[in-house]
Amino acid sequence: MISPTVFIIEDDVDTREMLAKFLELEGYQVEIAGNGLQALDRLTDGVEASVILLDLMMPVMDGWEFRRRQEKDARLRKIPTIVVSAAGRERMAQISADAYLSKPVDMDELLTRVSQFCAV
C-alpha cells in the first residue's frame, strides 16, 4: 500500500526539514518545494499530493499567488491545502484554505490536520 503524500511548500530549510522528517516518521511520503513556483512546476509535471502544507511568505511566488493559481487548475484545486504560517490568524484567513496552522507548529495539531485529509 502506498502512503499518502504531503507536499511541503516552505522556503525556510530548517522548517521544511523538520516537517518532512516528522511526517516521514509518521508514515507519510513527502515532496518539498522552496516556493510556490517550484511547487506549481512539480505539481503540473505530474507529482501527486494527498495534501499540501503551504507557507505564505516566500520569495519568487508566495502562498497567496500559489493559491490563486491552484484554484484555477481543475486537478490542483482538489488537493486539500493547509496554510502553515507565522502570519497572524487574520492574515491567514484572507486566503481560502482547508485548514490553518500557526508557526511555530504544534506537531500534534499538524498530525491531526494532515490525517483529516489522508489516512495512513
Language model regions located:
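Charged docking surfaces used in two-component/phosphorelay signaling
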Residues: E17-L25
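Receiver (REC) domain active-site loop signature in two-component systems and cognate sites
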Residues: M58
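C-terminal output helix
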Residues: V105-C118
